[in-house]
C-alpha cells in the first residue's frame, strides 16, 4: 500500500454490467469484515462508477448498502478521450477496474500515461470488432494487437485478464503443475460445463438465446469463430463450425463433452508453455440445441432476443463448473470449481458465472494493492511465476471449494477426444 495515498480512489468502468455487480457485491461484504485483507484499504475509499448508460442511484444503494456513502456515479462514453482523462485526473484515481467493453489498449495507455494501476477481466478492441474481414479470428486478433503494445506499459501496474477464464484458471494451471514439478504435461485443457438454466421451463420465450454472461460475446466465440487451439506456441484453426464437433472431458466422476472455442487464456498459456492448449465449453442444453439446429443459418441467430440469467427475476437451476485438465502420458490431473447460481444469489445477488469473474477481479485488486512487483503489464500466470504475488491466497477468501483429483488414465490429445455431431 506504500504506493497509494491514504484516501484511495478507484474507478470502476462498466459499472452497470453483470461483472461489475459481482465485483461490488464482494466489496460490499469486504468493507464490513475487519478480517478481510482489503478492509483497511477500502474502508475510506472513493468508488467512481462509470458507464456509458448509467444505472439509477437507487440500484446501487439497494444492492450495495455498505458502500453507498462511498459511491459516486458518472455517465461517460469512454471513446471521449478528453472527458475520460479529465475524470481520471480530477477524481485522483489510483486504480482502474475495467469490466467494460472499452478498448483495452486505449484505456491501459491512459493509465500508463497517468501512472494509474489497472486490472481487467478480458481483452476488448473496438477496431477489431468493427472489421468484418476478421470474422472467425477476432479474439485472436484482439490478443495479437494487445501483445504488440504490452511491453510499452512501463508506467503502470496492470493485471490483464483476471476474471475466471481468463484469470483464475491460469492460477489453477500453475497450482496443478506444482504437484508434478519434474513432469511436463502434453496438454492443458481449460474446461467449463455450465448447466445453469431456468428452473421453470414454461418461462422460456421463443426466439431467445439464454446464457449466464453476455450473450453477444458468447455468440462471437460460438458461431462467428473457428475452433482454435495452441500447439508449439502457435494458434491452429479448424475450418469448420465450433458446434460441428465436441471433445471428451473426464474429471473423476464428472464427464461431459465440450466444444472447442477460442479464448484468451488459451493464447496466453500457449505462448508461455509448450503444450497443446484448448478451451472446451458446454453451455446449457437448450442453447446448445438451438445453435446446432441453426448451423446452416447462424446469421439468423443474431436477430434473436438475448437473455442473461438473473436470479433476481426467475429461479435458476444448475451450476457452472470451470477448471483445468492437465494431460500426461498415462494419466491426467484436474482442478475445478463449481458454483450454484441459487446459492450465490442468496448471498451476493448475482449469478454463479459473474461471481466467479468477481472473485478473479478481487484477487487481482488485492495483489495490486498489497504485493510488491515492478511496473508492467502481467497476465495472471506471469504474475504468479515472476513475482511474489499472493493471488491464490486472496482468491481463496471468496472462492473456497476447489476439487483436485487424478485420472489414472489419459484420454489423449484433442484428436483422440473428438466426436462428430
For every predicted segment, state its role:
Residues 66-80:
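Rossmann-fold cofactor-recognition segment
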Residues 47-54:
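Conserved acidic E/D residue at the C-terminus of a beta-strand in Rossmann-like folds
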Residues 82-83, 99-110:
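Beta-loop-alpha module in the N-terminal Rossmann-like domain of NAD(P)-dependent dehydrogenases
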Residues 9-30:
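N-terminal Rossmann NAD(P)H-binding glycine-rich loop of SDR-like oxidoreductase domains
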Residues 142-195, 360, 365:
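Adenosine-phosphate binding glycine-rich loop
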Residues 122-154:
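Rossmann-fold NAD(P)-binding glycine/threonine-rich loop
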Residues 78-89:
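Conserved Rossmann-fold cofactor-binding substructure of NAD(P)-dependent oxidoreductases
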Residues 2-7, 178-421:
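C-terminal catalytic/substrate-binding lobe primarily of soluble NAD(P)-dependent oxidoreductases
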